[in-house]
């Protein structure tokens, strides 16, 4: 559980690895659930859900207190519109500026406890400054019992999916059915696969690629991507409404697109992850520690341009503005999107649309503002 989120990634305006601080601390999807009248039934259901979970676990947790505190926290959140604004959420601050912003929240103690070299806090990106300013006011008027109650709830809620059947089912009744409208929980084996996917996804990916994505398919898709980038280049050149200066910038950015096809060139090493067949929670803790150590190790060097943020067996694709890359996992490079034996028209109409969509993200209302023109060949 996190009152706020902290992660490191490439700075969209430079090649540096930098810490990002983001809002958090809520049990419901976003701040609107705490203020809009239409969500009053959801808020009531949350209180009831917390009470039931606490009863099953044999704990004393006040759902009303959790909701009251989270309503205050939500009041400092950016709404969804602000939170996707690339300019509003790019706030680079020095450590002194960040400490001043947080006020009553002692960020120095956090830095010490994080076990991260303090030099990485010399400059950070704060996505939602008003949240951290508000958090400082909450900590200036600290209600210990309310925060202990909140922390106990989030500890239970975060682990609920791995505990007893009653807790698993009650957790799903609220988050799966009440919030999401899903009537029935997935079979246990499917949930187990999801856990494995989220924990050692690239290890599974190796086997998936071996079975379903031969080198010949990768070569075909690489040619498709190259052709579609060429078509995009031609389209930009032929635009009559775009100024010459803007065209030059757009073409420069397009020329530095880095396509990633199918699977990573360098697989993640899981050899230090020790798991057991008899203790699920011990495995969850081991996975959490392994993941944290993996993230901390990133700070020892430059941005890892070989890293993927989806596994090969994921049916999806993405554009990464920080590295100006378009990424297509092997699982989306299957029928009906792509078939190595199909004619070109079929593949351009299928995976071609996906490739064009991801290309377009580099020039959409937010990612066009990413001025860093990264590629795997230049810096």
Language model segments and positions:
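Pocket-edge structural micro-motifs
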Residues: 21-23, 330, 375
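A signal for specific C-terminal beta-sheet/loop modules enriched in small/flexible residues
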Residues: 33-45, 340-351, 378
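Compositionally biased, intrinsically disordered low-complexity regions enriched in proline and serine
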Residues: 2-6, 34-35, 111, 176, ...
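Single conserved hydrophobic/aromatic residue that forms the stacking wall/gate
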Residues: 1-8, 12, 369, 373-379
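Noncatalytic, helix-rich "gating/capping" subdomain that lines the substrate-entry/channel surface
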Residues: 9-223, 227
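Short amphipathic alpha-helical segments with coiled-coil-like heptad repeat character
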Residues: 51-59, 256-258, 336, 378-379
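Intrinsically disordered, low-complexity linker/terminal regions across diverse proteins
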Residues: 66, 72, 101-104, 118, ...
